[in-house]
Amino acid sequence: MANVVVIGAQWGDEGKGKITDLLSRSADVVVRYQGGVNAGHTIVVDDQVLKLHLIPSGILYPETICLIGSGTVIDPKVMLKELDMLLENSIDISGLQLASTAHVTMPYHRLLDEAMEQQRGDQRIGTTGRGIGPTYADKSQRNGIRVLDLLDSQRLRERLRGPLQEKNRLLEQIYGVAPLDSEQVIEEYLGYGQRLAPHVVDCIQTIHQAARSRKNILFEGAQGTLLDLDHGTYPYVTSSNPISGGACIGAGVGPTLIDRVIGVAKAYTTRVGEGPFPTELEGSINEQLCDRGGEFGTTTGRRRRCGWFDGVIGRYAVAVNGLDCLAITKLDVLDELDEIRVCVAYELNGERIEHFPSSAEDFARCHPIFETLPGWQCSTADCRRLEDLPTTAMDYLRFLADLMEVPIAIVSLGANRDQTIVVEDPIHGPKRALLSA
């Protein structure tokens, strides 16, 4: 039995969906512990491309329980669309469970998110406009709506009376947005509650029953370490905690229940939205990485910013999450390059630093210090064993493992399930150096 957390070691979009899908084959329970529809993951099965925002990747395995935990925020309209899409693709959704205590994104959250971001002007932070920040803000202010409220007409009316009046006043008087019809909102969300009711459970009871039965539990994070509310590039962050510690809070488990933490990182770096990005590229190489990597956001459709692999934020992710091993994705995107650069340190105010600065202003002034490695200039897409990889590709992976000071367990070479080299099963295999310098 092993309980494993999968986190993003960069700014999100690292390929966690594919890695979680891969590991879900060995999991009895998959738990999404934070975030909302601001995250997206793509799973490719044969010719099927499934783009999900809320539903855990493990939904493709009929015997696996997929739990959306208390730390998430739920947009029921989006969730029901995803469920309908899965049913249309003949995917069994009976294993999906939703925490009754998860908070709900209401229509006023989306409207406020968009209005506030627009008002920020050139100080915008790059929000997805999906209402995530305002939903978490209401949660912190103890003014939020939870899934269980959608199951009781009287309770929902009582819970919404004050917030709806307050939000309508804000929308109308501050942002010039038309107010919402209270009765229409209530009826709409009661309808969502009726459809979701068969999936609503006590999250804590589900997880701890699985733990007592010595089941394998996989905790799936959204976004990435550098978007963490407390430990990311604040204020250019999300409104929750994607790091491994967030699994304990969002799922309701103690840290002693976690056996292993796996970090997912691209073989290069990407970022969506605003904020400093020291290794960001411009010109033809940026275009090449973006086009070959299909770097467009699953949630927003925005073109991702691309840059070289950043070992400084990588080491930071190892430390903050307590990573045991890494999964490196999209190695194949680098196949055509004659040389590849890796950031090993920064220069800040004329001094070399090897740590991640805590202020966004200092981070924006950091200049990357690179080491240049030779490329392999041949396709890796069909490699299925380490020994199939070109020597220079192996050297690159060893360099990353040495730089990050953590072994590599999985190498992904494309979107399909079979385009993967599993050096050692991270769930059942022993903790040992899998691919290291």
UniProtKB/Swiss-Prot annotation:
One of its GO terms (biological process) is IMP metabolic process. NCBIfam families: PRK01117.1, purA. CDD domains: AdSS. Its EC number is 6.3.4.4. It comes from Prochlorococcus marinus (strain MIT 9313). Pfam families: Adenylsucc_synt. SUPFAM superfamilies: P-loop containing nucleoside triphosphate hydrolases (SSF52540). The active site is at 13 (proton acceptor), 41 (proton donor). Substrate binds at residues 298-304. This is Adenylosuccinate synthetase. InterPro entries: Adenylosuccin_syn_GTP-bd (IPR018220), Adenylosuccin_syn_Lys_AS (IPR033128), Adenylosuccinate_synth_dom1 (IPR042109), Adenylosuccinate_synth_dom2 (IPR042110), Adenylosuccinate_synth_dom3 (IPR042111), Adenylosuccinate_synthetase (IPR001114), P-loop_NTPase (IPR027417). It comes from the Bacteria.
